[in-house]
Design a protein with these regions (language model features):
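Active-site cofactor/co-catalyst pockets and adjacent glycine-rich loops in catalytic enzymes
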Residues: 305
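Short helix/strand-capping turn motifs
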Residues: 298-301
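N-terminal capping/lid subdomain adjacent to the active-site entrance of alpha/beta enzymes
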Residues: 2-178, 183-192, 196-200, 312-340
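N-terminal short leaders/motifs
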Residues: 1-2, 277
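Catalytic core of soluble alpha/beta enzymes
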Residues: 155, 160-295, 309-321
């Protein structure tokens, strides 16, 4: 078993307030708890952040405990590939995996994009999420987002009254590109009829219309809008059964880290799938690793830190709807003393 000379310096639960309530079909959130870990070789450190997948029953406290238990059992922090065999996909593994990438960048003096064999990242257009609300409030939120420079909006839907919501959003921001996320809420609806109505309003992508266990109901449907798997696509093992979907949403917290997410992206391309890179509510430390995947994604939805009331220092930057990396993760050689 490959255990390298890396220890766990810190694991902590941190809370970030959400600027406005973040509402989807499953409820509203006014804050998010994340798990943040720091790994070290005694000279350099690496940091990673994970947001628990609450619909899987994860909690930040549980993730922190899982990280501590793994490191104690192994006598140190295992390397990334070994970590994939020891810990299931989820926020805990994501935090550790990304911390290991960050540490390697510091130790080698090479940015993570170079270590991963990628090109230097460029700014990417990110979607901005319009929370589920009344048509009037969603229209105003869309107009506000457009005034801030966002040209790609992602609207949260719930099944009942969705067409009226998108019609209102179109009035509020007539020139934006639109994608929608049903968060599994269309179980009692005619998916084809819903998709046709939204296609007429210029919707370019529909995320997760049905519950994950109902994927078979999508098979054979001729839809005018591509369908993207989110809750149905957690990790690499899920790809083989997603024939009814034209796209997948890769989130590092679902996949369990950048290592798995990169493997998923390559496998998805080989299978002819289009790629969305998404995120949970998170600080820029949690978003930064996904920025590398965004470089070759068809849709980018990395607004998780933009929805917070306050972010970390060195946060990612956004201008005219385009996201640029900050200085939090994966770039410079930073010693323990420099970062403390």
């Amino acid at each position: 078993m490959a255990v390298i000379d890396i220890g766990l310096q810190q694991v902590a639960v941190e809370r970030f307030a959400v600027r406005n309530a973040f509402t989807i079909s499953r409820g509203a959130k006014t804050f998010v708890d994340v798990v943040m870990c720091v790994v070290t070789d005694g000279i350099f450190i690496g940091r990673g952040e994970g947001t628990p997948i609450y619909y899987h029953g994860e909690t930040a406290e549980g993730c922190a405990a899982a990280i501590e238990a793994l490191v104690q059992a192994q006598g140190g922090v295992p390397d990334r590939e070994t970590l994939r065999t020891l810990m299931p996909p989820g926020a805990a593994r994501n935090a550790l995996d990304c911390a290991l990438w960050d540490l390697e960048a510091a130790r080698t003096g090479k940015p993570v994009w170079a270590l991963a064999g990628l090109k230097a990242p460029q700014p990417v257009r990110t979607a901005y999420t319009i929370s589920l609300d009344t048509p009037e409030k969603m229209a105003q939120a869309a107009a506000d987002a457009r005034a801030r420079g966002f040209t790609l909006l992602k609207c949260k839907l719930t099944g009942d009254g969705d067409q009226a919501r998108i019609e209102a959003v179109r009035q509020g921001a007539p020139d934006v590109d639109l994608i929608v996320d049903a968060n599994e809420s269309w179980a009692d609806l005619d998916v084809q009829a819903q998709a046709r109505a939204l296609a007429d309003l210029g919707v370019a992508l529909i995320e997760q219309p049905l519950p994950a266990q109902a994927d078979a109901a999508l098979a054979g449907l001729a839809l005018p809008v591509p369908i993207c798997a989110d809750e149905s696509c957690q990790s690499l093992d899920d790809l083989a059964r997603l024939g009814a979907y034209q796209a997948i949403n890769i989130k590092l917290d679902k996949a369990g880290g950048l290592t798995e997410a990169l493997a998923m992206a390559h496998a998805a391309r080989a299978a002819g799938k289009r790629i969305m890179v998404g995120c949970m509510l998170a600080s820029s430390l949690g978003i930064a690793p996904a920025f590398l995947l965004a470089q070759f994604a068809d849709w980018v939805d990395l607004d998780g830190a933009l929805l917070l009331a306050h972010d970390r220092e060195g946060a990612m930057n956004v201008a005219s709807g385009y996201l640029s990396p900050g200085t939090l993760w994966g770039e410079a050689i930073i010693t323990d003393a420099q970062r403390s």
